[in-house]
Amino acid sequence: MRHISRLTAVVMQDQKHIQNSSNRVQRLDLIYEQLSRNYSTFDQTDDPWMTNGLSSTPFRCLVSVCLSTMTVTPRVVKACVPLFERVSSFEELLALDDEALRTIIKPVAHYNRKTTNLKIMCQQILWDFGGRIPDTHEDLMKLQGVGRKVADIMMNFIFGQDTIAVDTHVLRALNRLEIVHKSVAEAAADEI
């Protein structure tokens, strides 16, 4: 969240210039330029998501993003680091005892439900998708515990598609910059 706040602050420095742009595409281009000047690449940041390897493999990315819903990054890191020390595949995660998994991921919100969701998701990937993470938005959304934001993140970071994951922080920035006028993240993602 702190990283999103810093990004928003950088963009907000140039807010008047951005808001004076006549259309949304120009505003998005100006925002991109502003962010590019301040953050040349995401990998160069001190972001704990990157420095702890939470997205270093497609498996890790999917599991950590599923655990991140309704949870701040430090708690996700606290759960994922020990989890990824024990498991490195969907087979290993599925074989892990439910109580052991529940204990490991206890730092994240809704850990009981997420334990169940992860187990079902592993079964779906192994049995319905031949052990491979689905590479379409539609199929990702069929996985237990995967919603729009998680699917968008996977499509962007793992499959290289031009999608944007809109959470409450991104939605707030988009509304402040008058890129969208929406109250629901999914509607904003559809619009942009």
Where are these regions (language model features)?
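N-terminal amphipathic/basic-hydrophobic helices that include classical n-h-c signal peptides
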Residues: 1-11
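Catalytic cores of DNA base-excision repair glycosylases
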Residues: 13-16, 22-192
